[in-house]
């Protein structure tokens, strides 16, 4: 049976589509021609071949291959030379830039002497100003670490002037067990008059103070049970006044976070000095009139010398910005009892500071994304607890009383003149009875590192080694020049090796030529002039 004819699709198009296709084709051809014109006419390189009938064909091809290899090697060598030149230029430019940067740094270090605008210089000058203007100096000590918060340099400055008196105030006595405070009072009172003290926790601001009857501040302080030790301190200061008509200036000094401004606020019974949980709140000298006979001078914190142990640097630093919290926690953990710290925070045993902070972060729920413990936050928490009142710790006094080298018997007699030691001991005993001291079983024992040295002269803050800095920079420049010379020697050595390789290659080729010529017979010169065109049977016929 004949199959039905299948109907093929028609090739007819609409005019719109056909003209569109033709237009696209024309545009494509035009574009191709344009690009061909840009590149220029292609020149096909003719392959220069050696006919088979030519004698010494193998030798000629070998020579051609050798020339090609030499040209390629020459190109590679030129390329390497260009790269080396570019690298040298780049190194020279970098060296110039580095030299200019080093000069700028050198100039900055030369100019970076401590100017009067520097905060450390300002603090040092303010402290010295307080020491000069004061008749009586009250050094505030932290009862948790009295030896570590004591500054022998400041005491020496005070004791050099014969008319000044020096007292010790054992602040934060309510954070230490009573027996420890009694022992520290015995140790410190053997050198200078010492008074235990506790600041008032909450003081009403002057702007929010209600109208009251005018009562002398000293009389109000005597009857105030919230400030133990204030009555004893005022009694001593009044006994040191030369007369009722003359007033004395009392300078309050000490390291950061010992409570200097809080002591003045507690004595004044009003918020006259700025206080805060952060270190270094007081920046300038402030005079407060306590009563007609006593004027208190609030001073900034003493500047810690960088030659102190790490624990003293962390705990006594005048600003929190200079304190590395993790390093501070590591230094603190090395000097405190592990068992008591574990009981305080209810954490397991740990091997190092990082493991302790990890356990503390898990205990307090301080976790980041993915359950990663926030060790920085835990370190900040532990450091703030240590600096504040949450973490209760104390230092044991020395077994045998060690007198400071700058305090002699004459100094002890001069400082205690006009002050009855028996009355002071009785007053201190009554003050200790009024304090609510914690039990020693729940407190961490801390190993003190001794007195903390401070910077009292602003010239010690100036950078004293500009010449050493210049010598170091010159040494670095000399080392860079030596490196450049070594690189140049290496480049010359590599070039010599390449020349030797090329010479050896040419020698091998010439030896191969000689062997071929000996085996093939006398060489034929194709470049010979066409003078001997006549045929000679004797010479031409072989």
From Swiss-Prot:
PANTHER family linked to this entry: GTP-BINDING PROTEIN-RELATED (PTHR11089), GUANINE NUCLEOTIDE-BINDING PROTEIN-LIKE 3 (PTHR11089:SF11)
Coiled coil: 56-114, 467-515
The keyword Nucleus appears for this protein: yes
Compartment(s) of residence: Nucleus; Nucleus, Nucleolus
All residue ranges annotated as the CP-type G domain in the record: 124-305
A biological process term (GO) from this entry: regulation of cell population proliferation
Coiled coil in keyword set: yes
Region described as Disordered: 1-119, 472-542
Protein origin, superkingdom: Eukaryota
Record lineage: Eukaryota, Metazoa, Chordata, Craniata, Vertebrata
Segments of skewed composition (Acidic residues): 472-500
Function: May play a role in regulating cellular proliferation.
Gene Ontology MF term list: GTP binding
Residues noted as binding GTP in the record, renumbered to the chain: 171-174, 254-261, 298-301
Bias-annotated ranges (Basic residues): 1-46
Basic and acidic residues composition-biased segments: 65-104
Family: Belongs to the TRAFAC class YlqF/YawG GTPase family.
Keywords: Coiled coil, GTP-binding, Nucleotide-binding, Nucleus
Name of this protein: Guanine nucleotide-binding protein-like 3
Domain notes: In contrast to other GTP-binding proteins, this family is characterized by a circular permutation of the GTPase motifs described by a G4-G1-G3 pattern.
């Amino acid at each position: 049976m004949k199959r039905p004819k299948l109907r093929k699709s028609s090739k007819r198009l609409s005019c719109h589509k056909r003209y569109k296709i033709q237009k696209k084709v024309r545009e494509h051809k035009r574009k191709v021609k344009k690009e061909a014109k840009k590149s220029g006419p292609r020149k096909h390189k003719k392959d220069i071949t050696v006919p088979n009938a030519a004698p010494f064909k193998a030798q000629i091809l070998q020579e051609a291959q050798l020339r090609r290899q030499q040209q390629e090697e020459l190109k590679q060598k030129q390329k390497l030379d260009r790269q080396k030149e570019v690298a040298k230029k780049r190194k020279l430019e970098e060296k110039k830039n580095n030299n200019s940067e080093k000069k700028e740094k050198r100039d900055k270090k030369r100019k970076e002497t401590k100017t009067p605008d520097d905060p450390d210089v300002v603090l040092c000058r303010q402290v010295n100003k307080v020491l000069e203007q004061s008749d009586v100096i009250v050094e505030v000590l932290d009862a948790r670490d009295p030896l570590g918060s004591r500054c022998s340099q400041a005491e020496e400055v005070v004791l050099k002037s014969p008319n000044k008196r020096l007292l010790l105030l054992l602040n934060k006595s309510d954070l230490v067990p009573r027996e420890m405070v009694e022992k520290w009072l015995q140790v410190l009172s053997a050198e200078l008059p010492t008074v235990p003290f506790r600041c008032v926790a909450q003081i009403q601001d002057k702007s929010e103070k209600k109208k009251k009857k005018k009562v002398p501040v000293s009389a109000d302080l005597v009857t105030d049970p919230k400030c133990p030790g204030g009555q004893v301190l005022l009694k001593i200061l009044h006994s040191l006044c030369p007369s009722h008509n003359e007033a004395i200036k009392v300078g309050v000094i000490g390291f950061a976070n010992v409570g200097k401004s809080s002591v003045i606020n507690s004595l004044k019974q009003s918020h006259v000095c700025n206080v805060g949980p952060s270190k270094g709140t007081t920046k300038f000298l402030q005079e407060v009139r306590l009563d007609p006979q006593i004027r208190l001078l609030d001073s900034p914190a003493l500047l810690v010398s960088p030659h102190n142990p790490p624990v003293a640097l962390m705990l006594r630093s005048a600003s929190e910005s200079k304190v590395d919290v993790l390093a501070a926690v590591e230094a603190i953990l090395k000097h405190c009892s592990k068992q008591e710290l574990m009981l305080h925070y209810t954490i397991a045993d740990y091997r190092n500071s990082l493991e302790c902070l990890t356990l503390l972060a898990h205990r307090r729920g301080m976790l980041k994304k993915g359950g990663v413990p926030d060790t920085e936050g835990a370190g900040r928490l532990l450091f703030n607890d240590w600096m504040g009142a949450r973490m209760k710790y104390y230092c044991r006094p020395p077994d045998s009383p060690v007198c400071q080298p700058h305090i002699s018997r004459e100094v002890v007699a001069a400082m205690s003149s006009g002050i009855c030691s028996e009355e002071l001991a009785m007053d201190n005993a009554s003050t200790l009875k009024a304090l609510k001291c914690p039990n020693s079983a729940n407190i961490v024992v801390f190993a003190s590192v001794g007195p903390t040295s401070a910077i009292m002269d602003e010239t010690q803050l100036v950078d004293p080694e500009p010449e050493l800095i210049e010598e170091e920079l010159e040494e670095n420049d000399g080392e860079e020049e030596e490196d450049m010379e070594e690189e140049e020697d290496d480049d010359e050595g590599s070039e010599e090796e390449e020349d030797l390789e090329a010479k050896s290659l040419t020698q091998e080729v010439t030896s191969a030529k000689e062997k071929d010529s000996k085996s093939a017979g006398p060489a034929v010169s194709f470049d010979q002039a066409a003078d001997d065109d006549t045929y000679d049977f004797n010479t031409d016929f072989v």
